[in-house]
Curated annotation (Swiss-Prot):
Domain Fe2OG dioxygenase: 552-666
TPR repeat positions: 42-75, 144-177, 205-238, 301-334
Record's protein name: Prolyl 3-hydroxylase 2
Endpoints of the signal sequence: 1-21
Lineage: Eukaryota, Metazoa, Chordata, Craniata, Vertebrata
GO molecular function: iron ion binding; L-ascorbic acid binding; procollagen-proline 3-dioxygenase activity
EC number: 1.14.11.7
Motif Prevents secretion from ER location, chain numbering: 700-703
InterPro entries registered for this protein in UniProt: Leprecan_dom, Oxoglu/Fe-dep_dioxygenase_dom, P3H, Pro_4_hyd_alph, Pro_4_hyd_alph_FE2OG_OXY, TPR-like_helical_dom_sf
Amino acid sequence: MRESTWVSLLLLLLLPAPQRGGPQDGRGSPEPEPERGPLQPFDLLYASGVAAYYSGDYEGAVRDLEAALRSHRRLRDIRTRCARHCAARRPLAPPGAGPGAELPFFRAVLERARCSRSCQSQRLGGPASRHRVSEDVRSDFQRRVPYNYLQRAYIKLNQLDKAMEAAHTFFMANPEHMEMQQNIEDYKATARVEAPLVDREAKPHLESYNAGVKHYEADDFEAAIKYFEQALREYFNEDMVCRALCEGPQRFEEYEYLGSKGSLYEAIADHYMQVLVCQHECVRELATRPGRLSPIENFLPLHYDYLQFAYYRVGEYVKALECAKAYLMFHPDDQDVLDNVDFYESLLDDSTDPASIEAREDLTAFVKRHKLEAELIKSAAEGLGFSYSEPNYWISYGGRQDENRVPSGVNMDGAEVHGLSMGKKSPPKIGRDLREGGPLLYENITFVYNSEQLNGTQRVLLDNVLSEEQCRELHSVASGIMLVGDGYRGKTSPHTPNEKFEGATVLKALKFGYEGRVPLKSARLFYDISEKARKIVESYFMLNSTLYFSYTHMVCRTALSGQQDRRNDLSHPIHADNCLLDPEANECWKEPPAYTFRDYSALLYMNDDFEGGEFIFTEMDAKTVTASIKPKCGRMISFSSGGENPHGVKAVTRGQRCAVALWFTLDPLYRELERIQADEVIAILDQEQHGKHGLNINPKDEL
């Protein structure tokens, strides 16, 4: 690591944390209170609750799921409190001079590590390693999936009020879940409830901010000030929590930690930079509402923008000036607020020097640290060779749209634009020439619709890609090779609890065929028809470069009996294949965990003896359907994989729907590994077959 980067790292580590509202992180910070008995790991309680639900033990399901949620909250609280406690008790010492200059610093690091381990083990009632969970479980809790099971279990127990509360909590983080929305309406109608529903996982800083905006718009400025100030205290507290949680274990993408050949400082840098980037992006996390991908634009600065005028309206000009100057720390060139500053200064008594009024103290240290983090990350990216693009966390499109944007007495020219993105954005552009209408290559294939007829971009619908006999053969082999949850990280019902998902890859099919567990001819058909589909897509869209397989998957989804009444959820929610669809912002974010390297997609259907299961395209709002396609044997829909083609699958309400799903890439670096292995298996099989024909053995000679 370069000298300047190492020095910056030390400076950042030694920079005192911004002061918070509430308890301070001083030397006298009290130790977290010990737990009564060992804390049970929330992932085990969650698994037990789900198992109880599916076995019909609804009381047990409620008991374990509620315990899992309590354990999850308590674990988060313990980690945060221990981080605060150890930061106060074991401050990092600055390096000295001369031989062993770095030893005081690393000694302090080791002491803090020991403090953290001891604190967590004592409060958890055992080693912290017991509470490390899989990405799937972490994702379920982030998406509030336990509340989905809870609302169903509470309904079975005739506890309507608790079911309604759990359903609302789940829906707030999953606003696209139509079934849950309908459940809530049904619960309200049955219980005749008029009071607002409670979100059990509501973020206090967002709730207070929303309340502040509501009072501000009603010209109740005293109440608005109360809630905005409360929102800021809660924001800074939540920022501290977020940063503490970033200090947990990190993933090392380029190497396994124990097998690393990197030096001491490379290992330190790798881990610390991941922690630092996580902490730096807490501002995005705190500005993002549950279930949304994009943050509220200009979120933190808007608190001070609202406050500066609210304080002006109640006659507190010094505080108005402090808040206006705080806002300028984010947007120093905002002419409206610069004018406000001049206006507020003109209202001060003669005894007050305007130059002595500085920006809010609660923000100064926060912004200083944020800027230092940005400089360090940029420096490290250049010196250590990793890529990082600094987001514009405080983006603003002109402020708020209201008559109170500028105080009376200050010139107002032109209309203001609301700070939040409300308008519908145009679909994202594809970074290559768009063409279609190339040859279909094979006889008997029937062209059905093109992009224009399907009301979109880069779309095509074809029939007779498979014959009836091939469909039957593929359906038959599917029953012999498919495994529940295959391709979905073992999840039986990854998208909806009302259907069972089974899948298999080409390589698995060939392996089963080679072992004689399914007919080799049928396994080979799976391989051959996927290659046929690839050639058709490459030819029809007139691509100038080779189209490679990114992932090939045979999948069947089966409607579960007894769970189809009043269904209005989707078998597969609306999404895009290479970006994260954000319907509220009308955006599709091309960033992990999306498969950003995918360029084209295709679905080849094998049957139509089921109900529901229509494939649908929508606008980027994930609601407006632009095309609906009924699957049948031999039908293939293909389209470009980006945000220009949001799509999903309607609920399968009876029977089993089977298809071959194919994703393609134009980048050879992202070729499907199993496909390359399958190519090698096919080459061996072809060679063996050729050898048999070449020898031309007379069966009588074998006697």
